[in-house]
Amino acid sequence: MKRAPVIPKHTLNTQPVEDTSLSTPAAPMVDSLIARVGVMARGNAITLPVCGRDVKFTLEVLRGDSVEKTSRVWSGNERDQELLTEDALDDLIPSFLLTGQQTPAFGRRVSGVIEIADGSRRRKAAALTESDYRVLVGELDDEQMAALSRLGNDYRPTSAYERGQRYASRLQNEFAGNISALADAENISRKIITRCINTAKLPKSVVALFSHPGELSARSGDALQKAFTDKEELLKQQASNLHEQKKAGVIFEAEEVITLLTSVLKTSSASRTSLSSRHQFAPGATVLYKGDKMVLNLDRSRVPTECIEKIEAILKELEKPAP
């Protein structure tokens, strides 16, 4: 997790840890807890308070190549699992590859499968990197699962798109369409709720254009949804075109995605000529195109020396002969 405390690797050992309990009702993901969990090994147990009730958790370790079969994300977790791509997890994957998972997830066992309340991003990162997935498993009811899920989302907030889906569900199922009542319950303004709900109406293929869904703000999502009212098929087609460009290696900034999507609403293409785009030819080798200009960016630590020398040789041919 991007802002979660990191468990130093050197604190790990294989000595059993006796059951303990936290006397304070604070959320379990605190510094003192991280230090205690860091020394746990498979099968060790710890007792923690969740929603004011003590829960005994046992550390289980799932193999990365089977984590998606032996676990699932709890249905009450609002994070959209389909949007957890390598780009969206770029804050986790490097550390998983280097040192493995640092902070255990939380979940419960249901019919032989572990349901994850907190740790869906780490679960996907473990699957993508085929790393071990560490989960503290306890007997949890839905209230406790919801509390742990919210705790995890405090470290890596869900997007306006994901929150909008939850708001829309609550608005219909719990508040009979009364936005004011929902706003009071969520302790946020009606405007924010309305913007998030409108953002959630966008096709998922549009949200997937961004590196991670959090790049699309509620304000921008709301404006985009309103701009394409009764024009959803046009929006989907443009999103499909941009996805094809991404597959070819083009990298878009968040602002560029929105500009390119809305450009199809204009009859003239003149406004598109000055847009910039970035193409990645290989790891460490990208080119930025902007109007008539092209900017080459090479990472000498990742691009072979012979390739850089060839590029330099071509550039030297452009040098004007000395007078």
UniProtKB/Swiss-Prot annotation:
It comes from the Bacteria. Residues 1-20 are annotated as: Disordered. It holds the Pfam family SoPB_HTH. Residues 180-199 bind DNA. One of its GO terms (molecular function) is DNA binding. Residues 11-20 have a biased composition (Polar residues). The keyword DNA-binding applies. GO terms for biological process: plasmid partitioning. The keyword DNA-binding applies. Keywords: DNA-binding, Plasmid, Plasmid partition. Belongs to the ParB family. Overproduction of SopB protein causes IncG incompatibility. Control of plasmid partitioning; required to recognize the cis-acting. Binds specifically with the DNA segment containing the sopC region. SopB is trans-acting. This is Protein SopB. It comes from Escherichia coli (strain K12).
